[in-house]
């Protein structure tokens, strides 16, 4: 039995971001298998040429069923990708169930230490959620995006976990939009998990501020380094969620869609290691596929918040 079975979803526009996530997992996690759902054929075909140990690429038709196909017909591509998050996690939990723990992870995560730290906080829990821990700049977002961020959702191999993830799947099939509906309390796939602490036993809200650190909470903390590791205050950084990070060209990036990052330690210790790893994979993929440029967004379409260009 493996310790961890992880799931993620990728389209052709997120292949470049997927590579650092997988690379960092290999660097920091000892016993895992990652299942990657490719939501378009080009992503699947390209990824066949980038083999990884402990990674399985899954085609969309392998897990779609009539319920999902009906949902696919009444929403945008982006909304359908969000709908697939709990559906694919449940698919992994059902088909490859020989693991102690499971988790959905967005492709724009980057690991700085072992994700086992998250589950070690409460090894017998059934579900693991990360609070946004919003900084003052983002306090008003709680009413729109909810308490928890579903870029990472963990589950134990328990009856409660299967029931919760199945319910999450059904909720998203019924309704999953990019609009933030404050009356209905929905936003994509995200806000449905707010019900879990009241509905299910064994829900653990992750305590570590080093889990799902991101643009919406990093301003709360002091970033530092100790013994070669990145710390958030006095806590080791487990993973950073690079939401709002944009690829403009092979050498130019926008660090944050929402504001300019003023803290130099955050840029040097968190963003630059990610950028350099990302650049390595852009170069490697484009050396094999010179015409592949999916995932870049023209500069005129990106807010002028924090551009950075490599030499």
From Swiss-Prot:
SUPFAM superfamilies: Nucleotide-diphospho-sugar transferases. InterPro entries: Nucleotide-diphossugar_trans. It comes from the Bacteria. This is Uncharacterized protein YfnD. The lineage of its organism: Bacteria, Bacillati, Bacillota, Bacilli, Bacillales.
């Amino acid at each position: 039995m493996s310790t961890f079975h992880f799931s993620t979803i990728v389209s052709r526009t997120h292949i470049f971001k997927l590579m650092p996530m997988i690379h960092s997992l290999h660097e920091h996690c000892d016993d895992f298998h990652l299942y990657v759902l490719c939501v378009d054929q080009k992503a699947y075909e390209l990824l066949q040429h980038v083999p990884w140990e402990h990674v399985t690429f899954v085609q969309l038709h392998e897990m779609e069923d009539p319920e999902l196909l009906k949902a696919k017909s009444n929403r945008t591509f982006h909304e359908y990708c969000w709908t697939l998050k709990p559906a694919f996690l449940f698919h992994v939990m059902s088909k490859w169930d020989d693991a102690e723990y499971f988790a959905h992870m967005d492709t724009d995560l980057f690991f700085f230490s072992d994700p086992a730290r998250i589950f070690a906080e409460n090894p017998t829990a059934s579900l693991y959620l990360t609070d946004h821990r919003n900084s003052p700049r983002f306090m008003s977002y709680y009413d729109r995006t909810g308490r928890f961020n579903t870029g990472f959702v963990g589950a134990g191999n328990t009856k409660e976990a299967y029931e919760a993830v199945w319910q999450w799947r059904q909720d998203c099939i019924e309704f999953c939009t990019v609009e933030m509906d404050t009356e209905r309390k929905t936003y994509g796939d995200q806000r449905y998990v707010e019900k879990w602490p009241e509905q299910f036993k064994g829900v653990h809200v992750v305590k570590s501020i080093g889990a799902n650190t991101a643009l919406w909470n990093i301003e709360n903390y002091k970033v530092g380094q100790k013994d070669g590791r990145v710390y958030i205050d006095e806590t080791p950084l487990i993973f950073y969620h690079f939401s709002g990070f944009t690829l403009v060209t092979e050498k130019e990036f926008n660090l944050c869609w929402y504001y300019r990052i003023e803290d130099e330690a955050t840029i040097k210790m968190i963003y630059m290691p990610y950028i350099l790893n990302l650049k390595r994979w852009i170069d490697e993929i484009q050396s094999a596929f010179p015409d592949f440029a999916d995932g870049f967004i023209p500069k005129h379409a990106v807010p002028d918040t924090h551009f950075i260009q490599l030499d």
